[in-house]
UniProtKB/Swiss-Prot annotation:
Main subcellular localisation: cytoplasm
Description of what induces expression: Expression is induced in a dose-dependent manner in response to high concentrations of copper and basal transcription is repressed in the presence of the copper chelator bathocuproin sulphonate (BCS). Expression is regulated by the CUF1 copper-dependent transcription factor. Highly induced during mice pulmonary infection.
Compartments it resides in: Cytoplasm, Cell cortex
Origin species: Cryptococcus neoformans var. grubii serotype A (strain H99 / ATCC 208821 / CBS 10515 / FGSC 9487) (Filobasidiella neoformans var. grubii)
Molecular function per GO: metal ion binding
Family the entry assigns: Belongs to the metallothionein superfamily.
Protein name: Copper metallothionein 1
C-alpha cells in the first residue's frame, strides 16, 4: 500500500502494516516520509514535528520531546534523546541515566550502568 499523503499533516497515513516502512514516527503518532513537509520546519517559519538535530529538520521517529532522528542508527530509534549539546543523539539508556551513542567516552562514564544493546556504552 502506497503512503500517499496530502500536503498537510496526516497522522492516519501509516496506520496500516503495509505502510509502516514509510513511517517516521510511532503508529498512531506518525508522519510519512512521502510527506516531508509534515516533519520538517515549514517555509513560513512555523514549527513542525522535528527532532532537536541542530535545527536540521530531520524527521522524528518518536513524539516531540522524546524523539530520535532518522539519521541515527536503527538500533537507537524510538527512544528518548540525551542532552549531548542539543545534538538530538539517540539514548542507549533511560532518561536521566543515559549516554548518547555519539558522546565522548568521558560523558558515558558518568552513568553507572544501563541496558545498552551491544553499543558498548557505559
Amino acid at each position: 500500500m502506497a503512503c500517499n499523503c496530502p500536503p498537510q499533516k496526516n497522522t492516519a497515513c501509516c496506520s496500516t502494516s503495509e505502510a509502516q516502512d514509510k513511517c517516521t514516527c510511532q503508529k498512531g503518532n506518525c508522519e510519512c516520509k512521502a510527506c516531508p513537509n509534515s516533519t520538517k520546519t515549514s517555509e513560513s517559519g512555523g514549527k513542525a514535528s522535528t527532532c532537536n538535530c541542530g535545527g536540521s529538520g530531520e524527521a522524528c521517529t518518536c513524539p516531540p520531546g522524546q524523539c530520535a532522528c532518522d539519521k541515527c542508527p536503527k538500533k537507537a530509534k524510538s527512544v528518548s534523546t540525551c542532552g549531548c549539546g542539543g545534538s538530538g543523539a539517540a539514548c542507549s539508556c533511560p532518561p536521566g541515566k543515559c549516554a548518547c551513542d555519539n558522546c565522548p567516552k568521558q560523558a558515558q562514564e558518568k552513568v553507572s550502568s544501563c541496558a545498552c544493546s551491544g553499543s558498548g556504552a557505559a
